[in-house]
Amino acid sequence: MAKNNKKIKTSLNIIALNKKARHNYFIEQTLEAGLSLEGWEVKSLRDSKVQIKESYVILKNNELFLFGAHISPLKSVSTHVNSDSTRTRKLLLNRLEINRIKDNINQKGATIVPLKLYWARGKVKLEIGMAKGKKSHDKRQDIKLKDWQRDKQRTLKETNKIFNF
């Protein structure tokens, strides 16, 4: 009897990250949403030709849409297809999730930001975060904390080198 020696791929392949979102916002809760995409967009996502740093999510007519995400079309895209790289894309969520998001948005200073774009079970998913904006002193505090952690790790590494020879 032959054994099936297929390698199992990880179920989570990150396409794009929005690192600025965690710097500019306090992320309170995250959700996974599907995306309504066209064929050429999926091909571009397979080549990681996407930018979500300047994108944002908006609620319109009880539906969520992703604005400002730039998906670069491939050179091999058909000429008869109009490839708009920054078109608005609908997010696919349950009604219960949309209602929960709507309740959170109604709070002062609350917003929805895209955090990462990834493959899950062969489909493109977008992780969105319900967030509140940080003030400049909060950002400075985070930078100080990161610097302190980095310096602490550096000194631990140096002391380990001295004692371990």
From Swiss-Prot:
Domain of life where this protein originates: Bacteria
Any one GO biological process: trans-translation
A GO MF term: RNA binding
Entry-linked Pfam families: SmpB
TM region positions: none
Keywords: Cytoplasm, RNA-binding
GO cellular component, one term: cytosol
Cellular localisation: Cytoplasm
CDD domains in the cross-refs: SmpB
Function: Required for rescue of stalled ribosomes mediated by trans-translation. Binds to transfer-messenger RNA (tmRNA), required for stable association of tmRNA with ribosomes. tmRNA and SmpB together mimic tRNA shape, replacing the anticodon stem-loop with SmpB. tmRNA is encoded by the ssrA gene; the 2 termini fold to resemble tRNA(Ala) and it encodes a 'tag peptide', a short internal open reading frame. During trans-translation Ala-aminoacylated tmRNA acts like a tRNA, entering the A-site of stalled ribosomes, displacing the stalled mRNA.
NCBIfam families: PRK05422.1, smpB
Family: Belongs to the SmpB family.
Protein name, UniProt field: SsrA-binding protein
Species annotation: Ruthia magnifica subsp. Calyptogena magnifica
